[in-house]
């Protein structure tokens, strides 16, 4: 619902904030919706950083907002599409992925995002097609090894693919599938008191998982969801 409270602590003014996003979307989300979710996150982030001392002075707030826009860089956006009808995180064809991926390319063209990637696409032939049929190939491919790898040879194939195409291979530990109500509430409610029902989610179309770092420094916000 957009209610996020982020405490960034003290940030050196010359160090840009590097943001990594992973967007989980269900089949109800269209490719055109992707930019909306990214813009919403940036708006919430900027509002969080420009509140308090700047709230009563529009000119100062505007200046601060421009500074923050320059410092807050979405360094990586990874797309995770919904599971198929067999309850596996797989993709039946490149034709299903491409419309969504092309929207990621538009975000790069608009300089809203620096790098883009996909999650849980471990079929080498499909990754080759993604390389051939896109203007901006994936900078990263994220895989959950335990659930996605059929054998050691598949891991080696992915590593070799990454080396050949200069693609960063990343490992994740997210629940697969992530957008089921039970799995999502389990992640969102971690740390809540037992019996808490305030943050329970009944219906969801998309979830953004984010991490924020200060360049040359440490992780400011390791992981969060909205």
What are the residue ranges of the model-derived segments?
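Eukaryotic N-terminal low-complexity, Ser/Thr- and Lys/Arg-rich leader segments
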Residues: 1-14, 32, 36, 46-67, ...
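N-terminal binding-site loop/beta-alpha segment at the start of enzyme catalytic domains
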Residues: 1-54, 72, 90, 95, ...
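Generic structural signal for well-ordered alpha-helices
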Residues: 4-7, 35-46, 62-65, 98-105, ...
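A structural motif corresponding to the C-terminal end of an alpha-helix
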Residues: 11-14, 65-73, 103-115
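Short beta-strand segments at enzyme active-site cores
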Residues: 19-20, 74-80, 116-118
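Generic low-polarity alpha-helical segments
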Residues: 19-20, 65, 162
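Active-site groove signature of glycoside hydrolases
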Residues: 67-89
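Beta/alpha (TIM)-barrel catalytic core signal, keyed to glycine-rich beta->alpha loops juxtaposed to Asp/Glu
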Residues: 81-226
């Amino acid at each position: 619902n957009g209610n996020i409270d982020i405490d960034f602590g003290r940030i050196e003014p010359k160090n840009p904030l590097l943001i990594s996003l992973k967007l989980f979307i269900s089949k109800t989300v269209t490719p055109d919706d992707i930019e909306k979710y990214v813009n919403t996150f940036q708006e919430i982030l900027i509002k969080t950083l420009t509140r308090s001392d700047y709230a009563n002075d529009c000119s100062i707030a505007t200046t601060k907002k421009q500074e923050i826009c320059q410092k807050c860089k979405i360094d990586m956006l990874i797309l995770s599409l919904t599971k198929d009808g067999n309850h596996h995180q797989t993709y039946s064809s490149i034709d299903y992925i491409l419309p969504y991926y092309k929207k990621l390319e538009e975000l790069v063209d608009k300089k809203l995002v620096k790098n883009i990637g996909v999650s849980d696409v471990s079929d080498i032939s499909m990754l080759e097609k993604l390389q051939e049929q896109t203007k901006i190939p994936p900078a990263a491919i994220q895989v959950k090894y335990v659930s996605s790898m059929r054998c050691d040879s598949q891991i080696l194939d992915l590593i070799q693919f990454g080396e050949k195409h200069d693609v960063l291979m990343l490992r994740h530990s997210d629940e697969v599938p992530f957008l089921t109500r039970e799995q999502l509430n389990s992640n969102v409610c971690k740390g809540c008191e037992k019996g808490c029902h305030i943050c329970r989610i009944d219906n969801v179309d998309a979830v953004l998982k984010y991490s924020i770092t200060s360049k040359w420094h440490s992780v400011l916000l390791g992981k969060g969801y909205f």
